[in-house]
Amino acid sequence: MMKSLLFSAHPTSLLLPAPRLRRLLRLRAASSASASAPPRADRRSPGTPSRRPSSSLYARPSLLDMERDRATRRADVDAFLTSLGVDPGELAGLELPVTVDVMRERAEFLGSLGLTQEDLAAYPLALGCSVRKNMVPVLDYLGKLGVRRDALPDLLRRYPQVLHASVVVDLAPVVKYLQGMDVRPTDVPRVLERYPELLGFKLEGTMSTSVAYLVGIGVGRRQVGSVITRFPEVLGMRVGKIIKPFVEHLEGIGLQRLAIARIIEKKPYVLGFGLQEKVKPNIEALVDIGVRKEALASIVMQYPDVLGLELRDKLVAQQSLFESSILVSREDFGRVLERMPQAISLGRAAVLKHVNFLTACGFMLSQVSKMVVACPQLLALNIDIMRMNFEYFKNEMERDLEELVEFPAFFTYGIESTVRPRHEMVSRKGLTCSLAWLLNCSDAKFDERMKYDTIGVEEMEREDSSDMNASVDEVESEEYEDSDYGDSDDEFVR
């Protein structure tokens, strides 16, 4: 029976699932249908507002919010600049710090360097420099070169653009150029302190052409470093507009180019005397006061500073002094200037002191006038040395005062180095000679004369009538050590 049931061709149907199982099957079917169905349209009415997404810590501000924030910060920075006296409009378009604190740091740092609010107002772009990226590297480089801290304020006022410079690209090549021109490393910082604008020059520009021109007219190549050290402004002078016209004008009054080169080597600052403002008017003033045109070149060679003085009024006052105190006529005053142009700068007290000394020695004022015209150096010598010369003349040489009137340059010779040895040699030989024959010659010429047994009258007269300036060339340096005339370059350096 059992066996027939198990293998029957028509088995009985299975039992239906339990209720819980049926529900589970229905849920799975519904889920599958919703996944395969297209999304439903939003059934909300058009007037129903959409929900705002929930805020998050990682949400980004909109571009509009960022622009508003940036404008607010810039307004704060502009207000701070205004409080410093700086016009914010001067910095329009420049990328500035986003906070007042950073801008305040820059202002305080520049203030620590010695710059004032007025300086910042004059060059507000300095506030556009980063302290760490721009200022510190530049200042550190200048300090290593030897630029003094107390010189920084003036350097930055004159050339604040250095704060924007690159040490490698802008500054180091200029320093290397200076050293290549034989400017000593110890002099480089002084050059930069005096002429900081040099740091902005390009090597292939004005610097090279000005040096080349100076060498071309005869300035020694080895003297270029000294010229630059004492007058670095020459590197910024254009040849065609400044240097060449200056040289050509001096050539026009009779100076040779090589002589001009020697003047530039000794006193390079003369190149800074404006041709139209100083040089030409001063040359005209000398001619107007009585100097002969053929003597102008000699005057400039002796006293190049005359080209840069406030000359016309000074000449009028000095001519009046000489006329009233020494009885020197206007024409003779011109001869005085030709022989010693430094007489222009002699003070009234110095002139009167020397005149009083000579009159105290027994000379009449008319004789003093003649002596000064023949040898203006009398007014510049040290009084004590003049006194020693006069006492030796009176006590040892026992000559007449008229000989000093005829040869006043006697006072310019050293007693021990020249006068005493020669006087004793002449005395031993029993020769009688004039002061000019005794002194107005070189040592070699005098030794040759000592071979003479007699002195020809013609030779004596020739020496007596010789140019007094020849004797002045023999002046010993000791005569001028404590002179009342001081010739200092500093007075004329610009």
Swiss-Prot record:
Gene3D superfamilies: Transcription termination factor 3, mitochondrial. It is found in: Plastid, Chloroplast stroma. InterPro entries: MTERF, MTERF_sf. Residues 32-61, 457-494 are annotated as: Disordered. Residues 457-466, 473-494 have a biased composition (Acidic residues). One of its GO terms (molecular function) is double-stranded DNA binding. Its main location: plastid. Pfam families: mTERF (PF02536). One of its GO terms (biological process) is regulation of DNA-templated transcription. Disruption phenotype: Seedling lethality. GO terms for cellular component: chloroplast stroma. Keywords: Chloroplast, Plastid, Transcription, Transcription regulation, Transcription termination, Transit peptide. Residues 46-56 have a biased composition (Low complexity). The keyword tRNA-binding does not apply. Residues 1-54 form a transit peptide. Transcription termination factor required for processing and steady-state levels of plastid transcripts. Required for splicing of the chloroplastic group II intron. Required for the accumulation of 16S and 23S ribosomes. Belongs to the mTERF family. This is Transcription termination factor MTERF4, chloroplastic. It comes from Zea mays. The gene is MTERF4.
